[in-house]
A protein has these predicted regions:
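A solvent-exposed, acidic/Ser-Thr-rich amphipathic alpha-helical stretch
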Residues: 25-68
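Short, aromatic-enriched amphipathic alpha-helices that serve as compact interaction elements
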Residues: 1-15
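Alpha-helix boundary recognition
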Residues: 12, 20, 55-58
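Hydrophobic pocket/interface hotspot
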Residues: 7, 19-20, 27, 46, ...
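A beta-strand edge to alpha-helix "cap/lid" segment located at domain peripheries
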Residues: 52-110
């Protein structure tokens, strides 16, 4: 399974621990969609921070994705829900290491 497919699967299942395991210890996840929902952008550094961040977001039902579709080997489109705001988004795996772990992933409004 490609890293983008694993990312979408973890997001759909709200698997914060599995999501964090997809990243290198110093992996970076940047989400720019939140500005469309009148929230601050997310810049999350490190797999432990990714785990804690999404544990909170999934646990309090403040983040989810719907209707994911793969665009290519590095990108997926979906509807991102930020606490009631739905935004069309595109996630891109920008960089992986030699083991296929994500070093950098960005999510932007489509």
């Amino acid at each position: 399974m490609r890293p983008i497919e694993k990312y979408v699967e973890a997001m759909e299942n709200k698997d914060f621990a599995g999501l964090a395991e997809l990243f290198t210890p110093d992996g970076i996840l940047c989400d720019y969609c939140t500005t469309s929902a009148s929230q601050q952008e997310y810049h999350i550094y490190g797999k432990e921070a990714i785990n804690m961040f999404f544990r909170n977001k999934f646990g309090f039902r403040r983040y989810s994705i719907l209707d994911a579709a793969f665009v290519n080997d590095e990108q997926a489109e979906f509807i991102a829900n930020f606490g009631g705001y739905n935004i069309m988004a595109i996630a891109t795996v920008r960089k992986t290491d030699e083991n296929g772990l994500i070093q950098r992933l960005t999510v932007r409004p489509k």
